[in-house]
């Protein structure tokens, strides 16, 4: 099947002549990336991703506030120390925190602290580490990823058990880490007890539990719990904590809940090319995000906008919501003829082309008016066909 890099949008956004087409194999009917051409300069009206959103004003202000004078580089500055204290407030005193530039680095480097090249990491078939990190774990760690089928983005102990029979067998990759995503790639959320069951099973079998928390804030907001209650309190060993998807400009954090696992991480981060010389500009963002509940306000708002969108979409003929809307993602089956017309005005991803399933993401800066206008276009499209 051919998938566009960016569908034709009217003159005010994208011209058809600016579109490239590439052939892509449909692997298990999972998400295919179709981005606007790099030549495009004008901003899109987008429900594609929370990565498409801008930066929260408080974050910009925080960056500007530390942009004065000279400080010690590579994280030995007062701003980084202050940011780490904020993490201790939210996740507990007994944590080690390291800042990196992006989510792939957070995942790969965090995993590398637990995994040898002869090990395997067990995850879902839609896990970001398997689907959207360009084999980075395999390339930089040399480990094997073992993927489990899932309909809701979650994996369960019963599935994991089936892949532990090779423990101790020198001919087999040795399972060492279970990796889960919170909120999942399908917009669902693990409840605290679900995480604890997996963590207890992992530790009983001498495995570690890794959590990709790119949208952890959205999960906590959805569950109405503290960040600690779905990480440290339920047995997570290493966490990739996301900031970029929740209003930051850039930056993620790798959090270790077992200090021993972090013993060599400063070397791993440096070797992994993720040690920022001007660390204060990442640290200041995290301090702002974790102050005055900004992380919660941003995530809660994004979740609310996603639920509002889902409620409105359910009223549109021939559309079906396919996943529980528990965070800030809406998955829906929409007639293909709707999709092509909708994407003349809005950019979003086609998740499963065969089923005509799309993904819409709400962000901290999505407004009710944005949702209203989007749904209005869908309703008009439905009436016109």
Which residue ranges define each predicted feature?
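N-terminal glycine-rich, Lys/His-bearing helix-loop that initiates the first secondary-structure elements
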Residues: 3-6, 28-74, 78, 89
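Intrinsically disordered, low-complexity segments used as extracellular stalks/linkers
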Residues: 5, 10, 15, 20-25, ...
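Buried hydrophobic positions in well-ordered alpha/beta secondary-structure cores of metabolic enzymes
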Residues: 47, 87, 106, 137, ...
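Active-site phosphate-binding strand-loop segment of PLP-dependent enzymes
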Residues: 47, 155-213
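Conserved N-terminal alpha-helix of the aminotransferase class I/II PLP-enzyme fold
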Residues: 56-103, 126, 130, 136
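Conserved PLP-anchoring active-site segment centered on the Schiff-base-forming lysine
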Residues: 113-131
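Conserved C-terminal alpha-helix-loop-beta "cap" of PLP-dependent enzymes
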Residues: 117-118, 307-385
């Amino acid at each position: 099947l051919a998938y566009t890099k960016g569908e034709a949008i009217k003159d005010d956004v994208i011209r058809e002549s600016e579109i490239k087409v590439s052939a892509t194999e449909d692997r298990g009917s999972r998400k295919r990336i179709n981005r606007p051409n790099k030549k495009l300069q004008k901003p899109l009206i987008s429900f594609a991703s929370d990565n498409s959103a801008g930066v929260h004003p408080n974050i910009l202000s925080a960056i500007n506030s530390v942009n004065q004078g000279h400080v010690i580089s590579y994280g030995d500055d007062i701003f980084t120390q202050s940011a780490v204290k904020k993490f201790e407030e939210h996740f507990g005193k007994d944590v080690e925190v390291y800042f990196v530039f992006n989510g792939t680095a957070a995942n790969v480097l965090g995993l590398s602290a637990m995994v040898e090249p002869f090990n395997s990491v067990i995850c879902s078939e839609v896990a970001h580490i398997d689907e959207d990190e360009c084999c980075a774990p395999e390339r930089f760690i040399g480990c094997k990823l073992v993927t489990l089928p899932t309909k809701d983005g979650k994996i369960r102990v019963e599935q994991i058990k089936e892949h532990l029979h090779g423990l101790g067998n020198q001919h087999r990759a040795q399972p060492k880490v279970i990796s889960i995503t919170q909120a999942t790639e399908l917009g669902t959320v693990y409840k605290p007890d679900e995480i604890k069951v997996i963590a207890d099973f992992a530790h009983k079998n001498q495995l570690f539990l890794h959590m990709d928390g790119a949208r952890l804030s959205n999960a906590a907001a959805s569950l109405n719990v503290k960040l600690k209650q779905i990480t440290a309190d339920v047995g997570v060993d290493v966490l990739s904590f996301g900031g970029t998807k929740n209003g930051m400009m850039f930056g993620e954090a790798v959090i270790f809940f077992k200090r021993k696992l972090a013993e060599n991480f400063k070397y791993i981060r440096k070797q992994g090319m993720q040690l920022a010389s001007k660390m204060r500009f990442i640290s200041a963002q995290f301090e702002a995000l974790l102050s005055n509940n900004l992380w919660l306000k941003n995530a809660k708002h994004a979740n609310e906008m996603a639920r509002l969108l889902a409620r409105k979409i359910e009223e549109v003929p021939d559309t079906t919501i396919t996943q529980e809307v528990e965070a800030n993602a809406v998955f829906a089956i929409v007639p293909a003829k709707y999709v092509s017309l909708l994407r003349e005005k809005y950019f979003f991803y086609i998740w499963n082309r065969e089923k005509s399933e799309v993904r819409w993401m709400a962000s901290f800066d999505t407004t009710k008016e944005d949702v209203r206008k989007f749904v209005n276009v869908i309703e008009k499209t439905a009436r016109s066909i």
